Structure formats: C-alpha cells, structure tokens
Amino acid sequence: MASFFDQVYLVVQQIPPGKVASYGQVAAILGSPRAARTVGWALASLRESNEADVPWQRVINSQGRVSIRNLRHAMAEQQALLEAEGVEFDARGYVDWRRFGWDGLSPVELEALLADS
C-alpha cells in the first residue's frame, strides 16, 4: 500500500482545474479526518520534480484562504496559479466554497484509485 504522503498526492491529482479542496477534506477522504496538518506537510514535502504532477495549489485552508508556509512558494504565487485556473478570490482573499469547492471522491472512487497505485 502507498504511504500516506503518496495517497495525498493521488487524491490531490484528482482535483480538477478551477476547483479547490481543504487540507481537512483531503485527510477525510483518506479516512484520517484529523490529519489535515499531515496533508500540509505532504504537500510542503513535494520535490520540485514532482510539483508539475501534483496540483498542490488547489489545496487551501478550510476558511477558503491560501495559507502556504513554504519557503519555495509565496502565498501570492498560489493565489495567482488558482486565478489562472479560473478560481476567484474576494477582496479579503477568500474563495467561495459553493462555486469552487471540489466535491471529492466517493469511497468506491478512492478504493479504485488506491488499487491502481
């Protein structure tokens, strides 16, 4: 079975352009709803060579804001990447979850995804 970090990457790869998910949502999909911080660590641990394959910018905090704390990427960079995909931020830097929130994966979809890895 893939490591938790690898499972995070597989789930994040399923988030389509123009949609966002929260760290907690990704953790909950993986059956670990209290592991939001670990999802953040997984994304912060991406090597530059893997960043093109994992759309890390599509994961934001549960309030609908960018909350990156990574020396390689600034918050403005993550917001710019999302805006280029059509995600809109209000004047205070919030995303409307109803418009841009990802519906996630069903347990059946997750099982199939992990079985293929």
Regions found by a protein language model. Name each.
Residues 1-117:
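Nucleic acid-binding interface residues in structured DNA/RNA-binding domains
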